[in-house]
From Swiss-Prot:
Expressed by the venom gland. PROSITE patterns: SNAKE_TOXIN (PS00272). Disulfide bonds join 24-43, 38-60, 62-73, 74-79. It holds the Pfam family Toxin_cobra-type. Keywords: Acetylcholine receptor inhibiting toxin, Disulfide bond, Neurotoxin, Postsynaptic neurotoxin, Secreted, Signal, Toxin. Its main location: secreted. This is Three-finger toxin MALT0051C. GO terms for molecular function: acetylcholine receptor inhibitor activity; toxin activity. Binds to muscle nicotinic acetylcholine receptor (nAChR) and inhibit acetylcholine from binding to the receptor, thereby impairing neuromuscular transmission. Residues 1-21 form the signal peptide. It is found in: Secreted. CDD domains: TFP_snake_toxin (cd00206).
Length: 81
């Protein structure tokens, strides 16, 4: 009985995840929307222009960017859409 109870507790903890992850978009501007699971507070949307036009990149973490690149970091599910 104790083993069953322990197993249920472990499964509950793994399934609930206690909000430490979030869902972020991770596609380039010309691609269909896709998502990935990221660490809390770690979605970004990076925008810049080149000979192809305006490029948008989305993903996890908040990278350092070069001058001329706009970065937007956020901390809720699918906030970088």
């Amino acid at each position: 009985m104790k083993t069953l109870l322990l197993t249920l507790v472990v499964v509950t903890v793994v399934c609930l995840d206690f909000g430490h992850t979030m869902i972020c978009y991770n596609q380039q501007s010309s691609q269909p929307p896709t998502t990935t699971t990221c660490s809390e507070g770690q979605c970004y949307k990076k925008t810049w222009s080149d000979h192809r036009g305006t490029i948008i990149e989305r993903g996890c973490a908040c990278p350092n960017v070069k001058p001329g690149v706009k970065i937007s970091c956020c901390s809720s599910d699918k906030c970088n859409g």
